[in-house]
């Protein structure tokens, strides 16, 4: 949808590390995971994305061994771990709260897991310091958690999780407690660390920006089911249904009715009361209801010189907001629908000199739209 966006690409030729087959889980008689199949590949950064209550954290806890499945099987590196206790799974989890021991130093927190595994004493110091160097905290080794910022505490939790070299690292909403600026910084650091370590990361979040920024692959969930599984670009550019479309980013959904098919790719349709050509890659019939999906950055507003020859949707500029690099225009269509248009700002372009209440046409480049069937009238 729109221009090609340089989002993370899924690594190719990866071998499976974790396989979930026929997973079912109930709580208090309520089925929260009805039937789930998922493969997680070696070395990838996979994000489970979805709203609260969609089952993403339950899936994470099942992989970690913190919950037991009611039916189904969990494989780790071709070994059945369905009934293996959490402490024997070679899987570590970083929680939202970090759960650092307040009475221990940073060094002691990171060393705790190694001591529990009875790692030889001579190995502990070099391994702890190596883990702290990876998260740029080697000079903080003797500090206590209360002497650290939120971002530093989060890094300590990650160092503690990776020091014993797990096969898999699970992160449950582990950035959500940070402020916006620090969260953005940690997104980049976390992805860089994952690449450096080569450990498979499974990250749980409800934040679509986090998912798009860090992931090799996103698994979009709703009601315990997978709605879409793909690269960030797949999810953003080619959403499979209206749920994914509405969740992943701000988007406009225009109602359309098929008039006729023009050729293999294009359909003539009535879109919000105006005839337009749209690209439709599935069979349609005259009169069929569709949804045309376009993001604010895919749209352009143009002055109307002749109403009879104007192309696109017609409306009136109601608001104009300067955002530095972009200019956002709120246009009210003739049918009352409000549409946000976001364009790169160019003060030398006379087309940007719109006045409030000016009559304008909204257009887009053909094929930038995503068209879905109306799910209520299939």
Curated annotation (Swiss-Prot):
Q: What role does it play?
A: Part of the ABC transporter complex PotABCD involved in spermidine/putrescine import. Responsible for energy coupling to the transport system.
| Record-linked CDD domains | ABC_PotA_N
Q: Which reaction does it catalyse?
A: ATP + H2O + polyamine-[polyamine-binding protein]Side 1 = ADP + phosphate + polyamineSide 2 + [polyamine-binding protein]Side 1
Which organism does this record belong to? Shigella flexneri serotype 5b (strain 8401)
One GO location term (cellular component): ATP-binding cassette (ABC) transporter complex
The residue ranges of the ABC transporter domain are: 18-248
What keywords appear on the UniProt entry? ATP-binding, Cell inner membrane, Cell membrane, Membrane, Nucleotide-binding, Translocase, Transport
What topology in the membrane does the UniProt record assign?
A: Peripheral membrane protein
Q: Does the keyword Transmembrane apply?
A: no
Keyword Metal-binding attached = no
Which positions in this protein are listed as binding ATP? 50-57
UniProt family annotation: Belongs to the ABC transporter superfamily. Spermidine/putrescine importer (TC 3.A.1.11.1) family.
Question: What is the protein's quaternary organization?
Answer: The complex is composed of two ATP-binding proteins (PotA), two transmembrane proteins (PotB and PotC) and a solute-binding protein (PotD).
Documented EC number(s): 7.6.2.11
InterPro entries of this UniProt entry? AAA+_ATPase, ABC_SmlMolc_Importer, ABC_transporter-like_ATP-bd, ABC_transporter-like_CS, Mo/tungstate-bd_C_term_dom, P-loop_NTPase, PotA-like, PotA_ATP-bd
- Top EC group: translocase
Protein name, entry field: Spermidine/putrescine import ATP-binding protein PotA
Q: Which SMART domains does this chain map to?
A: AAA
SUPFAM superfamilies recorded for this chain?
MOP-like (SSF50331), P-loop containing nucleoside triphosphate hydrolases (SSF52540)
UniProt-annotated location(s): Cell inner membrane
Q: Which GO terms describe its molecular function?
A: ABC-type putrescine transporter activity; ATP binding; ATP hydrolysis activity
């Amino acid at each position: 949808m729109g221009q090609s966006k340089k989002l993370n690409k899924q690594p190719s030729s990866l071998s499976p590390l974790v396989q979930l087959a026929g997973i079912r889980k109930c709580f208090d008689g309520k089925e929260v995971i009805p039937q789930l199949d998922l493969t997680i590949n070696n070395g990838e950064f996979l994000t489970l994305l979805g709203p609260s209550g969609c089952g993403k954290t339950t899936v994470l806890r099942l992989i970690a061994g913190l919950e037991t499945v009611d039916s189904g099987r969990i494989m780790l590196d071709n070994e059945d771990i369905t009934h293996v206790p959490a402490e024997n799974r070679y899987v570590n989890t970083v929680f939202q709260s970090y759960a650092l021991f307040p009475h221990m130093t940073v060094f002691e927190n990171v060393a705790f897991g190694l001591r529990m595994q009875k790692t030889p004493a001579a190995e502990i110091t070099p391994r702890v310091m190596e883990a702290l160097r990876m998260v740029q905290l080697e000079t903080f080794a003797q500090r206590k958690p209360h002497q650290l910022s939120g971002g530093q505490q989060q890094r300590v939790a990650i160092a503690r999780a990776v020091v014993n070299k797990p096969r898999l690292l699970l992160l449950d909403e582990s950035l959500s407690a940070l402020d916006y600026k620090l969260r953005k910084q940690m997104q980049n650091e976390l992805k860089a660390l994952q690449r450096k370590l080569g450990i498979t990361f499974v990250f749980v979040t409800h934040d679509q920006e986090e998912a798009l920024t860090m992931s090799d692959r996103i698994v979009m969930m709703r009601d315990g089911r997978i709605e879409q599984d793909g690269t960030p670009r797949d999810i953003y550019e080619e959403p499979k249904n209206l749920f994914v479309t509405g969740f992943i980013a701000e988007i406009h959904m225009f109602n359309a009715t098929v008039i006729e098919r023009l050729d293999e790719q294009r359909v003539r349709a009535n879109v919000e009361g105006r005839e337009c050509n749209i690209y439709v890659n599935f069979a349609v019939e005259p009169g069929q209801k569709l949804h045309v999906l376009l993001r604010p950055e895919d749209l352009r507003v143009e002055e109307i010189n002749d109403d009879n020859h104007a192309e696109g949707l017609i409306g009136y500029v109601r608001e104009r907001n300067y955002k530095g690099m972009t200019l956002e225009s709120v246009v009210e269509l003739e049918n009352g629908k409000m549409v946000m248009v976001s364009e790169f700002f160019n003060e030398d372009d006379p087309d940007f000199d719109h006045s409030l209440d000016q009559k304008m046409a909204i257009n887009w480049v053909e094929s930038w739209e995503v068209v879905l069937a109306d799910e209520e009238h299939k």
